[in-house]
Amino acid sequence: MNRRSFLKLIAFTTIFLSFSLVSKSNRIVRFEHGIASGDPTPEKVILWTRVSSNSDNSILVFYEISNTVDFKTIIASGKKYADRRKDFTVKVDAKIPKRYRGQKVFYRFRAEGAYSQIGTTFTLPKDVENFKIAVFSCSNYPAGYFNAYDSASNDESIDLAVHLGDYLYEYKQGEYATDNAIRLNRQPIPNKEIVSLSDYRQRHAQYKSDVDLQKLHSSMPVLCAWDDHEITNDAWKDNAENHQINEGSFSLRKRNAIKAYYEWMPVREPKTPFNNWKRYKIGKLIDLKLLETRISSRSKQVNLNDHVSDDGNFQKDAFFKELNNVQRSLLGNQQLDFIKENDRDDQTWNLYAQQVLLATLKLPTIPDYIID
């Protein structure tokens, strides 16, 4: 079965099963936000979903993994409660039996008679000659173009997706890149700049409701890193350009954003929440490091306008003094040590996935007829 046929099958399965009426207590359970997998290792992979219901009580959710799409043989399974503490999201670090590692497997969730759609995933292969990665970033729901996710999900040649950050944006309607949101029926939810934990959860839920994004997540593992907009624009360790005094503590806002991020994303959580850098070894072909460049160690960005005097003169000496200050940091010593320790010469490719542009980026003008 190819990926296109599989996606048609799970689309039907979703319609038929995920809206089942269930339980003797008349509770309705649905999987409205899809399923996802991510952070594969040679032995394990993260599986994610979110359960919606007409009750605030906890829900016991089961996961099943099979080597066939009909699930006649279950090769791994388990259960976990979904509750209010994590916004009814469920995340499991599933161990794949040895004989199936590095191969495509199928997974699904069920709760009280309702089934999620079926997803495909895998653990990292130990031996591979070719491996294709789709890269995404800066995905703003009100602006549209999430059909790129759909295109990737239908491409049989793609093995893995990487999202480099700005998976979502914090703005309200009328602000950045919301010009076509009303016409496209993609206005931000909630219609405010997100600050509280509830705000961030609602925004994640809106993004995960997008059908094209759901297709991507169900079709392959996705490696995810955050940039600034998962918190707020131009964030650094201690503050952000788009954080005002009347929005409360930036430290609290950052914690709210990252808590919601870990709840809603198929990522393995590190012991220190902000230190979200990781390594993925894909056979002897690729050693991929996913870096964190925003909120663990980043110093405040140098602002050119801060070094222009009232009479319009550029204060060059002061600018370069700040720019070249040896105390300034982007990655921090701990992450730099991680990079040095894992800079390998036994891999064909050493890849660094991160959010900072290293060259000029020029974007073409998109004609109006494409938008329409």
Regions found by a protein language model. Give the residues of each.
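Metal-dependent phosphoester/phosphodiester hydrolase catalytic core
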Residues: R3, K8, F19, K24-D372
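Sec-dependent signal peptide hydrophobic core
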Residues: I10-T14
